[in-house]
Amino acid sequence: EKVIGNGEKGYFEADKFTFSKPKGIITLINNVYMKSGDTELRTPDKAVMFMNENKFVSANATVKKGNDTLKGDTITAFFKDTKRFEIDRAFSNGHTEIRSEGKKAFADRGEYEAKTGLVKLFDNVKIIDASGYTATADIGIYSSTKKTFTLQNNVKVKDKSGYTAVAKNGIYDLNNKTFTLLNNVRIDKGSNVITAPKAIYFQQKDEFRFYDDVKVTQDGNTATALSGVYFIKKNIAELEHNVVITKDGNVVRGDKAISDFNTSKSRLVAKKGGRI
């Protein structure tokens, strides 16, 4: 028979428990489940509640809030009070995992704050998307309210199509399905390289849009422009506005260029009413 406890706005259960009144410690043992509002915590192992500190420590725990899930080898949670079982802050050590909207994020440790709805991930941060790309960074911040993953420092994206993208920072918007790369953006596909200060990946269109001084480097030639689009499935980039192609010291200018990543060559194309 399970042990069941009810707080003012919370609930817990476990297979059995022990209680040390002098130390103010309750140990819930096996198949632990706690609930407060839309937040649930589960662990198949034991969980230790330090009543005097409003603290809860558990191994192999899973915290679920709405559609978001946080897992950790060891989770230390602090309650607002022991009557509500409402989590105020939580820390995860060891293998840490977040699941939300088809995304999986991993790290070696994490921090959660209920007030801001932010989960901060540290050390070996990795995001795996169901569409086939993987993003890594030094630091990751997930906002449960905005539904965004912010990646900081040494951002790197690898896709099953074969390209690699790097930047200093990145923001993945789960609602709009966009991934914005900022500062020193570089995309490599074979011998082709695209650089720009800013790029946005549109997941539904499967394309990157580049802004502010785009540069494509290929075998023996470079092409620059104010903006551009890389069509991943077609494996070509289209550059527009103040296009300049340089090859073997020769320079040509125009309004639009196509950089073919299959042949590693760029060419100017005429727009209606445009110029070459």
Feature roles, as predicted:
Residues 1-276:
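Mature-chain termini and adjacent capping regions
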